[in-house]
Amino acid sequence: MSAEPHPLYRQLPAIDRLLNEPEMAPLLAEYGPVLLADTLRQLQAEAREYIGQFHTLADWCADWPAALRQRLNQRQPALKPVFNLTGTVLHTNLGRAPLAESAIAAVTDAMRSAVTLEYSLEGAGRGHRDRAVADLLCALTGAEDACIVNNNAAAVFLLLTVMAAGKQVVVSRGELVEIGGAFRIPDVMRQAGCELVEVGTTNRTHLKDYRQAINENTGLLMKVHTSNYSIEGFTAAVSEQQLAALGQECSIPTATDLGSGSLVDMTRYGLPAEPMPQQLIAAGVDLVTFSGDKLLGGPQAGIILGKKQWIERLQQHPLKRALRADKMTLAALDATLRLYQQPDRLVEQLPSLRLLTRPASEIAACAQRLLAPLIACYGTDFTLDIESCWSQIGSGSLPVDRLPSWALTFTPKDGRGSTLEALTARWRTLTKPVIGRVADGRLWLDLRCLEDEAALLRELAS
C-alpha cells in the first residue's frame, strides 16, 4: 500500500489563493504574476520537503508574503560585480578590462536611444557600422582601414577564411600558440579551410625558412605574437619588417596576430615593452589583429587593421556579418579610442592602465589602513599579515613580467585548509563577492585592483 500523504500537506495554501490575497498586491505590481507563481511553487516544494523530513511546518509558512519577498530579494543577476583581489589585473574569468567612465556613458546613451549605427547623416542614407571607429583607429595607427568584429578569435578566423581558404599559411613552429579555452592556431586554420605549413624550429626560425616554404599555393605569410608565453635563450625570429618585405617580393600578403595589442608605448609608464599595432603597420604588414579588452582597456572586440584592399575583402565576406560588433561594443570602443587622443591624461582616465601603473607604495598604504579593522573582524580565527607579492597583467599579456604589489594574508589559526575554504565560500556569497587566491596555506588579497576601501570593509564586516 502507498503511504498516506502527511496531513500537514493540506495546510499548504493553493497558489491561486495566495496570489489573490491583499498582501500580495504590492508584490504583483512589482514582479508580475508569472514570476510570483513560479517562486511560490519553489517555496511550496521546499515546504513539502521540510514536512517530509521534520514532520512540521517550516516557520516561514506562517507568513507567505514575507517569505516570498525575502526569496525575491535574494534573486541575483547572472553577472555580479565582484572585488578582484586575485592579483591578476586583466582577469579573463572576471571580465578583463574595466571600462572608462566615458565608455560606460557612451554605452548607456547607445542603449537608451536610436543611434547612427548604419546611417550616414551627411548622405541621409545607409552607412557602414565600422566607419567611425575605423577612422579613429586609422588616425591613431596610420593604417589605411580597419574592421571590427566581436573578439580577436573572430578576427583571426575571419582573416584566415578570407585571405587563405583553400591555400597554405606559413607560420613559424615557435608561434603556434594555444590560448585559454583551447583556442589553438592550427585548429583555427583547419576550421578556416587553410593548410598550415610550419617552418623553422620551436626556438629558431629564419627568413630562409619562410622563403623555402613559398609555392604557388601559398596564400598568407603569418606571424603570431606569443603573448602568453616566452621562449628565451638560444633563439632567433623573423621580424615583421623582414617578413613584409618577403611578402611584397613574392606578392603574398602578410598578417600578424598581436593578441593583446597596445596603442601606447608601455615602457613610458614603467611597464614592459609590448609590440604596438602602429609599429607593424609602419613595418609594412598587410593585416594586424588584436583585442579590444586587454591592454587597450576597452570592450571585448576584435580589431583588424591594414591595407584598404584587404580590409574591403574582409568587410564584403558573408562571415563578417555573423561576427560583426553591436552598437554597444562600438560605442564603448569609440569612447575608449578617443582617450588615446589625449595621451597625457590616459593613466587618469583609463582604469586598466591606472591599475597597471599603480605605485606599490600606494598599495602598501592601503594595506596598512585595512589591517586593523579586518583584524577586529577576523582576528579570532585568522592571523592577518601584510605581505609583498607580485601581480600579473593577465589575459595572456606580458606573461613573464610581474608587477610589485602588496597583499593582506589570512592564515587560519587552526591550520586547516577547510577553514580557508569556508571563508572563501562565505565571501563568494556576499552582496559584492570578494575574490582572492589561496596559496601556501593562506588566503591572499592582492590590493592592486582595490579602489574602494570603504566598500570592501562594509562587505567583509557584514
Curated annotation (Swiss-Prot):
Reaction equations catalysed: L-seryl-tRNA(Sec) + selenophosphate + H(+) = L-selenocysteinyl-tRNA(Sec) + phosphate
Recorded metabolic or biological pathway in which this protein acts: Aminoacyl-tRNA biosynthesis; selenocysteinyl-tRNA(Sec) biosynthesis; selenocysteinyl-tRNA(Sec) from L-seryl-tRNA(Sec) (bacterial route): step 1/1
Residue(s) carrying N6-(pyridoxal phosphate)lysine: 294
Location in the cell: Cytoplasm
Cofactor(s) listed: pyridoxal 5'-phosphate
GO cellular component, one term: cytoplasm
Superkingdom per UniProt: Bacteria
Entry keywords, A to Z: Cytoplasm, Protein biosynthesis, Pyridoxal phosphate, Selenium, Transferase
GO BP: any one term: selenocysteine incorporation
EC number(s) per entry: 2.9.1.1
MF GO annotations: L-seryl-tRNA(Sec) selenium transferase activity
InterPro entries: PyrdxlP-dep_Trfase, PyrdxlP-dep_Trfase_major, SelA-like, SelA_trans, SelA_trans_N_dom
Main location: cytoplasm
Role according to the record: Converts seryl-tRNA(Sec) to selenocysteinyl-tRNA(Sec) required for selenoprotein biosynthesis.
Subunit (UniProt): Homodecamer; pentamer of dimers. Binds only one seryl-tRNA(Sec) per dimer.
Homology family: Belongs to the SelA family.
Protein name: L-seryl-tRNA(Sec) selenium transferase
